[in-house]
């Protein structure tokens, strides 16, 4: 790779996709999607791995252009394998895994997660994973 190409890659913002397994998504999921649209750091694809097409209702999710829904059966669902399958639909540099009831508290979630990858250890070690804290709803 040429030095010019390395510089271009260093200046390019990492692309971010979000993978969300769902089962009977409701109002909280709709709020989650709306908060992902408001993020200060752009989200590429929102990849939804929905269990049981019969429980999917487009109402409330229209107009979200980067929403990619893939349906699977209950028999196909597995916590790890479903997330892995969802990740295969992404070509992003960073993939954020969320649950369908985890609504970001503010518009900085993705920005802060991406920022973690810019950090380096004392000897130049790179961050390979970052996570965010999830707060319970007030009614829990």
Segments predicted by a language model, with ranges:
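Cell-envelope/extracellular polymer assembly enzymes that use nucleotide-activated donors
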Residues: 14-17, 45
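Short, well-formed alpha-helical segments that are part of the catalytic scaffolds
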Residues: 25-38
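Short beta-strand/loop segment that forms part of the nucleotide-sugar
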Residues: 43-53, 72
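A conserved acidic beta->alpha catalytic loop
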Residues: 49-59, 102-103
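Catalytic metal- and UDP-sugar-binding loop of GT-A-like glycosyltransferases, i.e.
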Residues: 72, 98-100
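Glycine-rich, basic loop-to-helix element that forms the pyrophosphate-binding segment
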Residues: 73-90
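Short aromatic/hydrophobic "clamp" motif used to bind/position activated sugar donors
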Residues: 95
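Conserved donor NDP-sugar-binding/catalytic core segment of glycosyltransferases
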Residues: 107-140
């Amino acid at each position: 790779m040429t030095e010019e190409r390395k510089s271009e890659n260093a200046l390019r913002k990492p692309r971010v996709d979000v993978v969300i397994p769902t089962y009977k998504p409701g109002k909280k999921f709709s709020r989650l999607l709306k908060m992902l649209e408001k993020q200060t750091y752009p989200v590429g694809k929102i990849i939804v791995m929905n269990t049981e097409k019969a429980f999917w209702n487009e109402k409330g999710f229209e107009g979200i252009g980067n929403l990619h829904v893939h349906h699977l059966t209950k028999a196909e669902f597995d916590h790890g394998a479903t997330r892995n399958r969802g990740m295969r639909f992404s070509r992003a540099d960073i993939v954020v895994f969320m649950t369908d009831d985890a609504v970001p508290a503010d518009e900085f979630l993705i920005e802060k997660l991406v920022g973690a990858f810019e950090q380096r250890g004392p000897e130049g070690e790179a961050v390979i994973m970052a996570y965010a804290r999830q707060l319970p709803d007030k009614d829990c």
